[in-house]
Swiss-Prot record:
Upper lineage: Eukaryota, Metazoa, Chordata, Craniata, Vertebrata
Cytoplasmic side stretches: 600-623
Descriptive protein name: Ciliated left-right organizer metallopeptidase
EC number annotated for this UniProt entry: 3.4.24.-
Annotated Zn(2+) binding sites: 249, 253, 326
Side of membrane Extracellular, spans: 21-578
């Protein structure tokens, strides 16, 4: 049994990384999106996939978007540990998005609309009547509005009325107007549960959908379902960053990066769309996004003068029209808006994604916060094509060997997946592949290769082994060695028991005391200032510190109209201690009791537990 366990431990690191899968398009198309009443009445006459009218969207007086989080009462109770992880990840993601996107802010309070098709049985359609296009009779069974299974509080909703007489101006009020949500431009309902979608695919960490849009087409509200099991997974201390990345990905979807919203994107001026519409199919059959800022970002990234270089959309799981809400993985691997997210340290909030959000017409983007994508940089307009990817290159590989992920933070294996159309790339190994995590230096694992794990270690293709190693042949694979920058694209490396050595980019070197070679990657190390992994000592700044005052993560006002329905999380007189803590305390006291019983026969132990939590300013619960 112990032998089999050892074999299992040895084999475990060689399985490729299991990545998070996004099912946004599947979810969004099942959601009925509610728009302002005038748009609801007209929706039956509009062909959704066409841009029926060109809109000019002024981009002045924009301020950082204020995203409010609402925790619904139907969300299952979480342990203190789970709740803390959830609030930290969601709060940090919201702060990051607020620092990236500015918007024309909602005046006064954000108030959502009711679905006229739910509360109204028929509408007066005679244009000669006083109450033309107003509701004439209510549905008897109308109860509430919902968003992806979450019941929207009446306080968040506008009122609704019926006009029983087509010529009588006085309506009958069905629901009064709610007070609305103050200081908010977008309302996100966060529901944590192990839903059927979560259980069906373990790679699904979360999913979202927008359910309300404003008069300009901008999303105003949506729901994010976070799979309960996601909060229980924790491989390393940086696992927090995985959750933050997932939440940012889903937030970008509900804020506008959605194929369902392409027809709502706004033009900035005359002749803005090079194809007369946002998307079109190129000569190879690839559907691309052809908006002006996206084209410029693509040209810059791939160093191309191609005047019509749109960003390709993912063809896997695309609709019949070829549209997708993700980038094509072969071309934009590592982007925050790829369909499959790898480890958080390898995901980039890239300039092309931010360009797309800019071209929605609803946001001004802080492009200075874009992160280096690296994948395909400078490789030309044909990079990532199926015809070219089957040859080994700086980004693609062939076969199934071991090597390094293209960012050189992780060891990898040459594999393909459902989004790569048969192309192969080096993906991180599932376990202990991170060179920058010191704990991955497992005793006995490739000691002869001179590996060093730590925050300044990176992955190098190598086949070195100590001269006294009995192994006759060492295959080329990824190894972890220390590095330090001496200039742009210039660095030294250090192998175990060696001095620092110059490693000229694009060459290979030998190491004294070892046989074999180390290959020095070109245009990867010491070139991008923002390519630094989280470390074991890194701590996320408190969600409640005023790191970005403009994100306005303020507490809901407690005026007389709102207070009965809003309360901040943890503002309660008693707090429950988590089950894990209780069990731990029980075990400790059981041991203590056993020891004391040697001296006493009877002992009564009473434990009082209490916990304190700082109020979460922007995370809100329904009473």
């Amino acid at each position: 049994m112990s032998f089999l366990l050892c074999i299992g431990i040895l084999l475990l690191p060689w399985f490729p990384c299991v990545c998070g899968k996004c099912i946004f398009d599947q979810i969004q198309r099942s959601v009925n999106v509610v728009s302002p009443p005038t748009a609801q009445y007209a929706s039956a006459y509009r062909f959704k996939t066409q841009r029926s009218k060109r809109h000019i969207m002024p981009m002045d007086n924009l301020q950082p978007i204020r995203i409010k989080i609402w925790i619904p009462s139907e969300s299952p109770a979480l342990s203190d540990w789970e709740r803390e992880k959830l609030m930290s990840a969601v709060g940090e993601a919201v702060s990051e998005v607020s620092s990236l996107l500015s918007v024309k802010r909602v005046k006064d309070r954000l108030l959502l609309n009711r679905d006229v098709n739910k509360y109204c049985k028929f509408i007066w359609r005679n244009s000669s009547t006083l109450n033309h296009m107003k509701c004439g009779r209510a549905h008897e069974n109308y109860r509430f509005e919902s968003c992806l299974g979450v019941i929207i509080p009446d306080e968040h909703l506008d009122g609704c009325s019926v006009y029983p007489n087509p010529e009588h101006p006085v309506p009958t009020v069905l629901r009064p107007r709610g007070p609305g949500v103050p200081d908010a431009d977008f309302l996100l309902y966060v529901f944590t549960h192990n839903t059927e979608k979560c259980r069906a695919e373990s790679s699904v960490l979360a999913y979202t959908a927008h359910c309300q849009t404003g008069s300009d087409g901008r999303p105003l509200a949506g729901t994010m379902v976070i799979c309960r099991e996601t909060l229980k997974k924790e491989r390393y201390t940086y696992q927090h960053f995985v959750k933050v990345t997932t939440v940012i990905h889903e937030l970008f979807h509900v804020l506008g990066f959605s194929k369902e919203l392409l027809s709502n994107w706004k033009d900035f001026g005359v002749d803005c769309w090079s194809h007369g519409q946002v998307t079109s199919t190129d000569q190879t059959g690839q559907v691309r996004l052809y908006s002006p800022t996206v084209i410029r970002a693509m040209q810059k990234h791939f160093n191309s003068t191609h005047t019509d270089l749109g960003a390709p959309l993912e063809n896997k799981d695309a609709a019949l029209d070829g549209l997708s809400s993700h980038w094509e993985a072969r071309v934009l691997q590592g982007s925050i808006m790829a369909a499959s997210l790898v480890e958080a340290s390898l995901v980039r909030i890239d300039a092309i994604t931010l360009a797309a959000l800019q071209d929605t017409g609803w946001y001004s983007v802080n492009h200075s916060r874009a992160q280096s994508l690296v994948w395909g940089e400078g490789e030309g307009s044909d990079f990532g094509s199926v015809s070219a990817c089957h040859n080994s290159s700086a980004f693609f590989c062939t076969g199934s060997g071991l090597g390094c992920h293209f960012l050189h933070l992780n060891k990898g294996e040459c594999v393909t997946d459902q989004y790569l159309d048969g192309c192969h790339i080096f993906k991180p190994l599932a376990n202990a592949s991170e060179c920058w995590i010191e704990d991955n230096a497992r005793s006995g694992m490739n000691e002869g290769g001179g590996e060093i794990f730590g925050s300044d270690s990176r992955c190098f293709i190598s086949n070195i082994t100590r001269l006294n190693n009995v192994t006759a042949y060492t295959p080329v694979s990824g190894h972890c060695y220390r590095h330090r920058c001496t200039g742009i694209n210039k660095y030294h490396i250090q192998v175990k028991d060696s001095d620092w050595m110059d490693c000229p980019a694009g060459t290979s070197i030998e190491v004294s005391g070892y046989q074999g070679f180390i290959f020095c990657p070109e245009n990867r190390l010491c070139k991008y200032s923002d390519l630094a992994p989280p470390t074991s000592t890194q701590r996320t700044e408190s969600l409640f510190s005023d790191t970005t005052a403009q994100s306005d993560l303020g507490m809901m006002e407690k005026d007389a109209a709102v207070q009965p329905s809003f309360t901040s999380l943890f503002l309660v007189s008693e707090a429950k201690i988590s089950l894990a803590a209780v069990l731990s305390l029980m075990a400790v006291f059981a041991l203590l009791s056993a020891a004391v019983l040697l001296y006493r026969k009877n002992l009564s132990v009473r434990v009082h537990a209490a916990s304190y939590r700082t109020p979460l300013p922007h995370i809100l619960y329904r009473n």
